[in-house]
Amino acid sequence: MAITQIQLFSVPVSDQDRSRDFYRDVLGFQVLGDRQLTPEMRWIQLAPPRGDTSITLVTWFPTMQPGDLKGIVVETDDLDGDVTRLTEAGVTFTSGIDEQPWGRFATFDDPDGNGIVLQHTTNRVLI
C-alpha cells in the first residue's frame, strides 16, 4: 500500500452555513472551498490553519445524519486558553479537562451534536 495520509473526511450537518460559521469563526478553521456543485450538493471544505487533513460539511449522505459523527480530534498548543476562549464564545464542554499520561483533552459538540475532542498531546502514541 502507498497510502500516505488521511486527506479529508465528511462531517454530517443540517445547516451548512451555520456549521461553516462555527468551524471558521469559532474554531478558526480556514475555508478552502465553498461551491454549489449541483442544486442538491454544496461543497464546503475547511481545515485548521496548520492542518493537513480537511473536512467537508455534508447534507447529502442519507446514511450520515447530523450529530452521528463522534471523535473528531483536533490538536491545540494551548488547551487551557482554547477552552477559555471557546467557553466565552458560547461552546458548552461535555467534559472538563481530562489529564492522561499522553496529554490532556476536553470534549464538546458542534452545532449539530458531532463530537469534538480538543487535545494537547505530549506523545504521538496515545496509549
Task: Please report, for each region that a protein language model flagged, where it lies by residue.
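Conserved catalytic-core motifs of GNAT/GCN5-like acyltransferases
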Residues: S10, Q30-T38, D98, Q119-L126
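Core segments of cupin and vicinal oxygen chelate
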Residues: V11-D52
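Short hydrophobic/aromatic beta-strand element in the GNAT-like acyltransferase core
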Residues: W43, V73, F105-T107
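Active-site beta-strand termini and strand-to-loop segments that position acidic
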Residues: L46-R50, F108-P111, T121
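Short, charged/polar surface micro-motifs in flexible loops or helix N-caps
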Residues: P49-S54, T63-M64, L79-G81
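Short, small/polar residue-rich loop motifs at catalytic or cofactor-binding pockets
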Residues: P101-G103
